Amino acid sequence: MTSVAKVYYSQTTQTESRPLVAPGIRRRRVLTKDGRSNVRMEHIADKRFLYLKDLWTTFIDMQWRYKLLLFSATFAGTWFLFGVVWYLVAVAHGDLLELGPPANHTPCVVQVHTLTGAFLFSLESQTTIGYGFRYISEECPLAIVLLIAQLVLTTILEIFITGTFLAKIARPKKRAETIRFSQHAVVASHNGKPCLMIRVANMRKSLLIGCQVTGKLLQTHQTKEGENIRLNQVNVTFQVDTASDSPFLILPLTFYHVVDETSPLKDLPLRSGEGDFELVLILSGTVESTSATCQVRTSYLPEEILWGYEFTPAISLSASGKYIADFSLFDQVVKVASPSGLRDSTVRYGDPEKLKLEESLREQAEKEGSALSVRISNV
């Protein structure tokens, strides 16, 4: 038996200026390659009010540059706001020098005679610097109440800000960035069956506990009633060579989906790389060090699924007995024999009325015993 010549296929890295789509094909994907949503929400009533009602999530999801700008402005704003209040207290009590206080006058706040001095006293009190040059006296009970109110309110504000910063830093999203999916999916024979395969790797030494990979096939679907579902979701199951539901992701693993008669992919044009569907992959697991749930996502368009290829082995053994995962080979594939037992299907797109007419004519031809093939142009 003649062996199949192996030809290495180097993957192309996706960028915004060079997407992984063929020229002339409109880029349409629900999920980007790095797992971000590609959906734009429009015409949401009271959207800003809804975001303000959930301030915690809003601040955590906020980008760092806006978060730092907002919180810096918040601190400076509270210093200035309470500085103005302290200045008004000094005006009401007659502490300003231009008001001509008597020689034995005891001010509410010593050495606060201007708005600048009031601002500095507010800053020193809120940050607990306490230089000692400006201090509150026992003359004004209102000033004592104001100082307590400022410290309580600003302490709550600092707790909220510190909490959002820590929550944003500790999010498992950053851990998810060290989980890598292969740029392409491949279709080849595995254990005598045609399989769609993807490769996943953990680039940290700390493990993910209870890993599970699930898939969602997104495509336009027409019901028997003629209703068009724009993004119909169908589950696509993946497994490793073992029967375990929780693979040991210490080395790069290849996950398989058997494309048989029960597979939702059996009628898709996988060989041609054409069609109107998207395969979304989701890996879920628990971070070993923090026990937080981590989820990694990616998606594959038809042109990102390679027919008749398999992944190049990326695991080797060193002279010292250590296993080596070579990530320079992670995205490389090798040409193999085309998988057998899988028909090259085509998916029809176009006007639903034309598709209905095609189907009815085809059924009629089958009843009449005719081998006539019917196809209506979408022009």
UniProtKB/Swiss-Prot annotation:
Topological domain ranges for the Extracellular compartment: 89-114, 132-140
Compartment list: Membrane; Basolateral cell membrane
Disulfide bridge positions per record: 108-140
Key words of the record: ATP-binding, Cell membrane, Disulfide bond, Ion channel, Ion transport, Membrane, Nucleotide-binding, Potassium, Potassium transport, Transmembrane, Transmembrane helix, Transport, Voltage-gated channel
Activity regulation note: Channel activity is strongly regulated by variations of cytosolic pH; channels are activated by alkaline and inhibited by acidic pH values. Activated by phosphatidylinositol 4,5 biphosphate (PtdIns(4,5)P2). Inhibited by Ba(2+) and Cs(+).
Record-listed ATP binding positions: 210-217
A biological process term (GO) from this entry: adult walking behavior
Residues the record marks as site: Role in the control of polyamine-mediated channel gating and in the blocking by intracellular magnesium: 158
Keyword Lipid metabolism annotated: no
Catalytic reaction annotation: K(+)(in) = K(+)(out)
Free-text tissue specificity from the UniProt record: Widely expressed in adult brain, including in the neocortex, the stratum pyrimadale of the hippocampus and the piriform cortex. Expressed by cultured astrocytes and also by cocultured cortical neurons (at protein level). In the distal segment of the nephron, expressed in the distal convoluted tubule, the connecting tubule, and the early cortical collecting duct.
Cited Gene3D superfamilies: 1.10.287.70, G protein-activated inward rectifier potassium channel 1 (2.60.40.1400)
Keyword Calcium set for record: no
Recorded topology in the membrane: Multi-pass membrane protein
Membrane-spanning segments: 62-88, 141-166
Effect of inactivating the gene: In the neonatal period, knockout mice have a significantly lower urinary creatinine concentration than do normal mice, indicating polyuria. The urinary sodium concentration are significantly elevated, indicating renal salt loss, and calcium excretion is significantly reduced. Death occurs after postnatal day 8.
Topological domain spans for side Cytoplasmic: 1-61, 167-379
Function: May be responsible for potassium buffering action of glial cells in the brain. Inward rectifier potassium channels are characterized by a greater tendency to allow potassium to flow into the cell rather than out of it. Their voltage dependence is regulated by the concentration of extracellular potassium; as external potassium is raised, the voltage range of the channel opening shifts to more positive voltages. The inward rectification is mainly due to the blockage of outward current by internal magnesium. Can be blocked by extracellular barium and cesium.
Record-given protein name: ATP-sensitive inward rectifier potassium channel 10
